[in-house]
């Protein structure tokens, strides 16, 4: 998000430094060479060797430990890296950032889901060589992916990315609940059962990221105002224990994009009240702000935002101030509209059709698609078999 905010502020060179670091991390993982990114990296100068991951020395066990979430790969985080690279690409004469985004997209595409209303699952959790697969689906993640795949399709002219965007957008649309005028947070591990948690970003982001959503789902703003507003700003969820600076910035940006400038400026004033001494912004106005979620690494503990300077909060504050939409890399709402939706199974088929390494599976897909026959049971069996095949080995510097 910081890279996109820098682009929005006209700081192309600084944004490119972050983009270059992202590309370097893709190519210099200690284990993976398949186009993925980790959820976190150690801060500092990028020099040589493998990308350094955050961790700590445990004196009791006398060894180096790493957080299982941080070493994993959430598809939503990868989508934001795609958006960052594509925002830099928009002001760059080189295609390397666009190519990097395509590499990330290729990795994410394998998580297209056939259950329920499709979309993409969460990614991976834990250490190599066999991290756990996240089978839940997130409204937020799929919103990010719809925007990222859509931008990539526009920049490259490759229709398969448009198909991916359509699949992600379709999932987000089906998470809308007219009864509460809100988006569900996503699904449980079964990929079907809705997660009832009400999260601010799941209400705001679709309206900024999906064409026509700001009008179609405008009542989500009213729901957020009625159920998540606090101290003239917004909280993460319904607890309303304090202001969530990042989310307040997101709502301010949405209102600015909708032409509701007065309301947006009022929220920017609330954000300014959360300035930290280092000229950054605190994540929240309270010591610990609940999200409604529990920690993946310790399900007995709640996931909180703490009153500490937060780069995400500063980045969204900048985006709100500049009126720059990170989902479009412009100062406007999305204008493109995906083509006629394909089923999740068809989208999965289109992706693997391009991978010649899949051999027989590829030919089976060709027969089904060219004949116009799409027996769902057969397609589900094919998709399951395709996931078990070993992915192609690539040189880390090779662009898919």
Task: Provide a role label for each language-model segment.
Residues 27-63, 70-76, 92-249, 256-258, ...:
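Extended ligand-binding clefts on enzyme/binding-domain cores
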Residues 2-12, 203-204, 255:
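Alpha-helical support elements that line or immediately flank enzyme active sites
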Residues 14-28, 63:
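Aromatic-lined substrate-binding rim segments of carbohydrate-active enzymes
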Residues 347-348, 352-354, 359-378, 385-386, ...:
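Intrinsically disordered, low-complexity serine/threonine-rich segments
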Residues 1-8, 18-21, 80-84:
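Non-membrane alpha-helical segments in proteins
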